Each structure stands twice: as C-alpha cells, then as structure tokens.
Amino acid sequence: MSLDPTIAARLKRNADGLFTAVVQERGSGDVLMVAWMDDDALARTLETREATYFSRSRGEQWIKGRTSGHTQHVHSVRLDCDGDTVLLVVDQVGGACHTGDHSCFDADLLLDPEA
C-alpha cells in the first residue's frame, strides 16, 4: 500500500517522517487518544478503515486492537489546516487506552469544567 501522492504532498512530517493523529469517537465526540502515523500507516488506514499507527518505541506499525480486540473502525479521516495532524473519527470497540480505559484522557482531570 502506498499513500496517494496528492495526499502525501500535503502532509508535514517531523524529522522522523511522522505526523500526529488525533482520534475521536464518532457517537460521543470524545477524544480517545493521540498517536503517531507515517505515510504507510495512513495509506493502510485509508484503504482498510482499520486504524493503523506507528509505534515510536517499537519502530513499527501497529493496528489498533490487533492483539487486544479493542478495535477502531475508521469512519472518516481529515487533514488539519497546517497539514501536520490528521483527525480520525472512529467507532471504538472496547477501551481506546492501553490501560483499558475508554479514553486516554479519562485518568487525570487537571481543571474542572466551569459550571
């Protein structure tokens, strides 16, 4: 799988060839997680609708839920105005966080919402 050249030309990557992926749940609008992608991970995601990311620690792609069963079916993908971040809107099965939580942002509330 290779990324469409017109999409690749619009992406701004860091020195390691990666860009940020923000993941939002389709039904609730919750932000579930933030991950990294490379061109191949985005190409695979666009082709299969299975959320695929790049692990900086392992130096390889990983498909969300391949081992845990906590999958993300990708409903849509958008590129931000700067070209350095994509937004994946997904249908989440199970927890999105590696801790098992629904969202990676469930654990620490630093500022309570205003009343």
From Swiss-Prot:
It holds the Pfam family PRA-CH. Its EC number is 3.5.4.19. Keywords: Amino-acid biosynthesis, Cytoplasm, Histidine biosynthesis, Hydrolase, Magnesium, Metal-binding, Zinc. The keyword Ribosomal protein does not apply. Pathway: Amino-acid biosynthesis; L-histidine biosynthesis; L-histidine from 5-phospho-alpha-D-ribose 1-diphosphate: step 3/9. It is found in: Cytoplasm. It comes from the Bacteria. InterPro entries: PRA-CH, PRib_AMP_CycHydrolase_dom, PRib_AMP_CycHydrolase_sf. Zn(2+) binds at residues 81, 97, 104. The keyword Methyltransferase does not apply. This is Phosphoribosyl-AMP cyclohydrolase. It comes from Mycolicibacterium gilvum (strain PYR-GCK) (Mycobacterium gilvum (strain PYR-GCK)). SUPFAM superfamilies: HisI-like. Belongs to the PRA-CH family. Its main location: cytoplasm. One of its GO terms (cellular component) is cytoplasm. Gene3D superfamilies: Phosphoribosyl-AMP cyclohydrolase. Its cofactor is Mg(2+); Zn(2+). NCBIfam families: PRK00051.1. Binds 1 Mg(2+) ion per subunit. Binds 1 zinc ion per subunit. GO terms for molecular function: magnesium ion binding; phosphoribosyl-AMP cyclohydrolase activity; zinc ion binding. It catalyses: 1-(5-phospho-beta-D-ribosyl)-5'-AMP + H2O = 1-(5-phospho-beta-D-ribosyl)-5-[(5-phospho-beta-D-ribosylamino)methylideneamino]imidazole-4-carboxamide.
